[in-house]
Amino acid sequence: EDKAVPAGPPVTQFQTGELTIGDYTFKAQYIPFDVRREVCGAYHLIQADSYRGNYFFSFYNEDDEEQSAKIFEYAIKDDRLTPMEEYNIDGSNALSIDRNGILYAMDPFDVYCYDLNSSDPEEPGDALDYMGSCYSSKDRDLTVIYWTDSAPVLVQDGEYTELTLEGDNEIGPFCSMPSLNLSGDELLTVGEPDSSGDYYFAAFDLDGNELARSSQPVGSFDAVMMKRPNGYLLDTGYMWELYAPDGTFLEKSLPVGERETLCQLCGDFCTFDVFLPLEENAFLAVGHHGKATEPDEPVVFRITTDF
């Protein structure tokens, strides 16, 4: 029997294309949600991660407490995001899933763990000793918890380690470090070396050793970052920046104009919240898009690239 079609505005359609940044090409495929969701309010509206080939999302909407207090599981079927499961877990402040199916989620003040493979995945364990954004490795038993300007905390085998980043400033090389995430086996960060207002990208290994630092300031203190085979990709707000493995600046997309902007790739400017790895030459870009006349909606693009 046909499922009732949910009421509400239709999902926006995007005419995707391709974009050349420096020597590298990016191609986008739009993967629409079956059901339009609406997000609004905070700056980071969407949290997302993957597990066993499915995708888990938190859609924050300050006007919809019920939606904001849930995590939604989707599968990609026929190039669409199809709903699979809903969990009564609030992941609006942080959401990550490790390779064993342990889901980390932060309510306003505490991080809790949930076992997606248990008989009751909505039953939390005890609150962890730390709070902050969560990033989980798919290759090893590792989750990183990060609260702005605090030492990153590595969670491995139930042990917590506060990692000291290499450098002689407040936090590694920086006096403040607004952005951090885990990509592969590296911690990618954006911070301010002094109080000049210029922010730089730096990558560290899991022992805290600096591996790379950007040769020039990046476009925003708040960046979505990903390690790629040929270097590092940063989204700094309507613009993508490419850096070589040692941090040398390569090229960036243009912020405005007719060509060489992200509009050419995705069909419009979108705010990206998360990059999720796929195979070596592809990743998912998860974000949101809105017009002045209506609330934002979540969007997902499959990006294929030689970078």
For each predicted feature, which ranges?
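N-terminal "mature head" segments of proteins
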Residues: E1-A75, L81, E85-N88, V111
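A short beta-strand motif characteristic of beta-propeller blades
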Residues: F26-V39, R80-Y87, D120-Y130, E159-G172, ...
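Repeated scaffold domains used in trafficking and secretory/extracellular systems
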Residues: C40-D49, I89-N100, L128-L142, E170-L182, ...
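Conserved core beta-strand positions within WD40 beta-propeller blades
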Residues: N54, G101-L103, D141-L142, D185-L187, ...
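Residue position within the beta-strands of beta-propeller blades
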Residues: F57, Y104-A105, I145-Y146, L188-V190, ...
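Structural motif
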Residues: D64-F72, F109-Y114, D149-V155, S195-A202, ...
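Short loop/turn segments that connect beta-strands within beta-propeller blades
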Residues: A75-D79, D115-S119, Q156-E159, D205-N209, ...
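Blade-level signature of beta-propeller repeat domains, shared across WD40, Kelch, NHL, RCC1
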Residues: D273-F307
